[in-house]
């Protein structure tokens, strides 16, 4: 990937900044939320302010482009910040604290609390506070970087024009040299089940329940299903996840890790019905919901009764009413916008990134695409190695991986070796009395190059970034094994697993 400093130097030599600075003076006088009879002129117009969109807008402005970002919602940050990644992590963190205090964990550490009570409204208030601070932070960054924020639904009304429309019908026209679509994704509906965000909820509703349900059924045991199911299970709900596939954790997870992960969640009280499909859901007169299920291959029907039904079978690209059809931009069979390696659509000055294009629907993937996309507009190199994009499940313990799984390597016919190290043998995990899980490293059998890293355990979401860096630089298992890691730390388990992969045995197990 071409470094950002080179892009800046390249632009400076071309006089790009001087040429655009005059335009930026005009942009700085435009309010963050503006509607006028006069069109706004821009070099780059970003539709959507989620992780991909807002980062792309800021980067474009930093590169000297006169930049506009259009957002249909009142707050910036998209799904991730408002009703996704951020609020779910607040609830996951706080529900974990409650679980430790309410169960036997604290007592086993010599911390005796006579009575632990859940104040759900206070917990939700802390979640909202975190979201508000971060959405306000984006608004501040826009102002600081002179990104013009236009509130409204953005539609491409010409190859060089975007029109933003508010709920009251007011419009703002933006004339623009480049258009970047970063509209993200939306919840995939379940045929025959209507979401009311009260007792039949999507991930959005599950983040704002008014009380802890007695019984919760989750359709889908992927990342979102196990995360949100964990929140309410910790807070006292009886949770059952119904999953069509034969494993938990979604697509891409290593099967050995998945089996161990499922075992740990079940030990916590989480129930699973795998290889099972939901055939319908009926609300009863008493407010409860009968969920009809049967084996994925067909068979005897069964009914599970619950207070709340959470539908999380995935997400789909949000591309409706963007004006793509009028421009002749056709979607692929999965509803995604086809782009080339520079994120250009069939119309060269219209780009797309994030959940609306191919690849994993991850916030950090969208951020990377946003940055390199606008660097490409400025003449920089455009490259991203999707094999180095990590995935994380923020349960406790966490699950994280980057690179290939064992199943993928077998399917591709790649010869590999495996190194494992359990957290039960890690000093820091022992002192923390938090020893579930392991680190699993997959290395090339002859070259020793790291091909994949799979972590189940405390702090996996942080540790996986060391693995991502190693993969990005093409490191061998021995390279990591010979890097001195501080003691006692959880990351020593990562080093030990690489020792096991490279030399056949770890030191401490």
From Swiss-Prot:
Active site: 487
Cellular compartment(s): Mitochondrion matrix; Nucleus; Cell projection, Cilium, Flagellum; Cytoplasmic vesicle, Secretory vesicle, Acrosome
Note on cofactor: Binds 1 FAD per subunit.
Keyword match Cytoplasm: no
Transit peptide: 1-35
Residues bearing PTM N6-succinyllysine: 66, 104, 122, 132, 143, 159, 273, 277, 410, 430, 505
Superkingdom of the source species: Eukaryota
Signal peptide: none
Enzyme class, spelled out: oxidoreductase
Modification type N6-acetyllysine: residues: 66, 104, 122, 132, 143, 346, 410, 417, 420, 505
Oligomeric form and interacting partners: Homodimer. Part of the multimeric pyruvate dehydrogenase complex that contains multiple copies of pyruvate dehydrogenase (subunits PDHA (PDHA1 or PDHA2) and PDHB, E1), dihydrolipoamide acetyltransferase (DLAT, E2) and lipoamide dehydrogenase (DLD, E3). These subunits are bound to an inner core composed of about 48 DLAT and 12 PDHX molecules (by non covalent bonds). The 2-oxoglutarate dehydrogenase complex is composed of OGDH (2-oxoglutarate dehydrogenase; E1), DLST (dihydrolipoamide succinyltransferase; E2), DLD (dihydrolipoamide dehydrogenase; E3) and the assembly factor KGD4.
Further comment: The active site is a redox-active disulfide bond.
Family under the similarity heading: Belongs to the class-I pyridine nucleotide-disulfide oxidoreductase family.
Protein name: Dihydrolipoyl dehydrogenase, mitochondrial
Taxonomic lineage from the root: Eukaryota, Metazoa, Chordata, Craniata, Vertebrata
């Amino acid at each position: 990937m071409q470094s950002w400093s080179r892009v800046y130097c390249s632009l400076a030599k071309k006089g790009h900044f001087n040429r655009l600075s005059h335009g930026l003076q005009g942009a700085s006088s435009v309010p963050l939320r503006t509607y006028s009879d006069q069109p706004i002129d821009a070099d780059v117009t970003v539709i959507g302010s989620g992780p991909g969109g807002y980062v792309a807008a800021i980067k474009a402005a930093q590169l000297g482009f006169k930049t506009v970002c259009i957002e249909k919602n009142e707050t910036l940050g998209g799904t991730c910040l408002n009703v996704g990644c951020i609020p779910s992590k607040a609830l996951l963190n706080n529900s974990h604290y409650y679980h430790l205090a309410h169960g036997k964990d604290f007592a086993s550490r010599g911390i005796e609390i006579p009575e632990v009570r859940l104040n759900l409204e206070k917990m939700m208030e802390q979640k909202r506070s975190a979201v508000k601070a971060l959405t306000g932070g984006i608004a501040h960054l826009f102002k600081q970087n002179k990104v013009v924020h236009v509130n409204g639904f953005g539609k491409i009304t010409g190859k060089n024009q975007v029109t933003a429309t508010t709920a009251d019908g007011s419009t703002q026209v933006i004339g623009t040299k480049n258009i970047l679509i970063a509209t993200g994704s939306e919840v995939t509906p379940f045929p025959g089940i209507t979401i009311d965000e009260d007792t039949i909820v999507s991930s959005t509703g599950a983040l704002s329940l008014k009380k802890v349900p007695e019984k919760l059924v989750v359709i889908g045991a992927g990342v979102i299903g196990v995360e949100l199911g964990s929140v309410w299970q910790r807070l006292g709900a009886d949770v059952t996840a119904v999953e069509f596939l034969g494993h938990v954790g979604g697509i891409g997870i290593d099967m050995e890790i998945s089996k161990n992960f499922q075992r740990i969640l079940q030990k916590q009280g989480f129930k699973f019905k795998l290889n099972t499909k939901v055939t319908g859901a009926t609300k009863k007169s008493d407010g409860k919901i009968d969920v009809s299920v049967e084996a994925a291959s067909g068979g005897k029907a069964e009914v599970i009764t619950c207070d709340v039904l959470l539908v999380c079978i995935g997400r789909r690209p949000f591309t409706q009413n963007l004006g793509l059809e009028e421009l002749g931009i056709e979607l692929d069979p999965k509803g995604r916008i086809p782009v080339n390696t520079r994120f250009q659509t069939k119309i060269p000055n219209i780009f797309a990134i994030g959940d609306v294009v191919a690849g994993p629907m991850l916030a950090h993937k969208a951020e990377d695409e946003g940055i390199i996309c606008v660097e490409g507009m400025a003449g920089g190199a455009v490259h991203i190695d999707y094999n180095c994009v990590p995935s994380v499940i923020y349960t406790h313990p966490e699950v994280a991986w980057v690179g290939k799984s064992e199943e993928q390597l077998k399917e591709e016919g790649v010869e590999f070796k495996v190194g494992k190290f359990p957290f039960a043998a890690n000093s820091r995990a022992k002192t923390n009395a938090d020893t579930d899980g392991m680190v699993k490293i997959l290395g090339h059998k002859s070259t020793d190059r790291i091909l994949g890293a799979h972590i189940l355990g405390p702090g996996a979401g942080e540790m996986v970034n060391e693995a991502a860096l190693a993969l990005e630089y093409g490191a061998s298992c021995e390279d990591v094994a010979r890097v001195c890691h501080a003691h006692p730390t959880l990351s020593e388990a990562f080093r030990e697993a690489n020792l096991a992969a490279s030399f056949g045995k770890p030191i401490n197990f």
